[in-house]
């Protein structure tokens, strides 16, 4: 959704309270934000990626807020600290959030600059039955050392509908068990296994 919504949403999020496990954090630790209508009630909601403190070695946190209808505030609906890999110190490793027109949220992690394996992963998160689930999993990557039979970097590419268990990996159909996986229960190994990869 339009970035003009982000400033007031960030301000109201800083005052949000919920039964979810809330964590207080200053605005300068917010490294990615997206506004969209996650629950499709016609009001803008918010998602944030928050980096850990400088003294911590844990991963980034993901926090998703829902707008309280008829109230001028956001409520924390999902709190996932130590969830998203990524670094703001190195270009090409920053986590990203993208609000989709259909109300879904894309959560992107990547390593596009360092090491032998370069990759990009996208979780498509949807709001269903009053909770957030992982509806889709997309992964692409390449090996900077290993070559294929054509002398090009060996690549991987997978697009999976988690809800149906159907997708494609390296241009071949793949079928996994259809699953309704809550975002809080998601492990990247679920998608990697379905695609026939390991990382």
Predicted regions and their residues:
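N-terminal signal peptide c-region/cleavage motif recognized by signal peptidases
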Residues: 13-19
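Blade-edge motifs of beta-propeller repeat domains
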Residues: 20-28, 70-92, 178-182
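Acidic/hydrophobic-patterned starts of short beta strands in beta-sheet-rich repeat architectures
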Residues: 40-51, 98-110
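Beta-propeller blade termini
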Residues: 29-40, 90-104
């Amino acid at each position: 959704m339009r970035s003009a919504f982000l400033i007031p949403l960030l301000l109201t999020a800083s005052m949000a309270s919920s039964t979810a496990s809330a964590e207080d954090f200053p605005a300068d630790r917010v490294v990615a934000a997206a506004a969209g209508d996650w629950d499709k009630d016609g009001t803008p909601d918010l998602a944030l990626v928050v980096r850990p403190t400088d003294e911590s070695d844990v991963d980034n946190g993901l926090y998703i807020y829902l707008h309280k209808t008829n109230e001028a505030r956001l409520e924390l609906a999902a709190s996932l600290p130590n969830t998203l890999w990524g670094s703001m110190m190195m270009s090409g490793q920053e986590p990203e959030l993208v609000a989709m027109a259909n109300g879904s949220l894309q959560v992107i992690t990547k390593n596009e600059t360092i090491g032998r394996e370069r990759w990009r992963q996208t979780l498509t998160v949807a709001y269903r039955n009053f909770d957030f689930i992982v509806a889709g999993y997309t992964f692409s990557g390449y090996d900077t050392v290993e070559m294929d039979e054509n002398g090009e970097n060996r690549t991987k590419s997978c697009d999976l509908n988690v809800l149906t268990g159907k997708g494609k990996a390296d241009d071949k159909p793949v079928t996994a068990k259809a699953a309704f996986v809550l975002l809080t229960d998601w492990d990247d190994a679920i998608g990697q296994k379905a695609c026939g990869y390991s990382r």
